[in-house]
């Protein structure tokens, strides 16, 4: 279930958990994202059974070796939510392409909640 790349003189294997770590880091790098949502996205059938799921996110490697991402976040109420979603999509795609060398088919950002400071 790992991502394999043939390179002379051997193979480079990227575990699905590495992809979730990259997605988590790219998502949390945006100042408008307070944290990942505590829920896990519902399980959907995978085309090849490849991918990984972690708290608030899911990464699937499709049959054509492209990647799809679903990430659920809790946002800062002062953030522009539309801009936050677009920037997080771009950050995730760039990080996966640059760090892991995978082609990204889609990144879906779900803003599940905004969190206000309790002292306000």
What are these regions (language model features)?
Residues 1-81, 86, 102-120:
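Contiguous, often N-terminal, cationic amphipathic patches that form binding interfaces
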């Amino acid at each position: 279930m790992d991502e394999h790349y043939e390179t002379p003189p051997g193979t480079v294997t990227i575990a699905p958990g590495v992809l979730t770590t990259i997605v988590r880091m790219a998502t949390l790098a945006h100042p408008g994202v307070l944290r990942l949502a505590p829920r896990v996205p519902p399980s959907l059938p995978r085309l090849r059974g490849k991918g990984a799921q972690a708290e608030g996110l899911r990464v699937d490697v499709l049959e054509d070796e492209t990647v799809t991402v679903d990430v659920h976040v809790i946002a800062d109420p002062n953030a522009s939510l539309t801009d936050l979603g677009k920037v997080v999509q771009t950050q995730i795609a760039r990080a996966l392409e640059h760090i892991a060398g995978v082609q990204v088919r889609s990144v879906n950002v779900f803003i599940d909640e905004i969190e206000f400071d309790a002292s306000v």
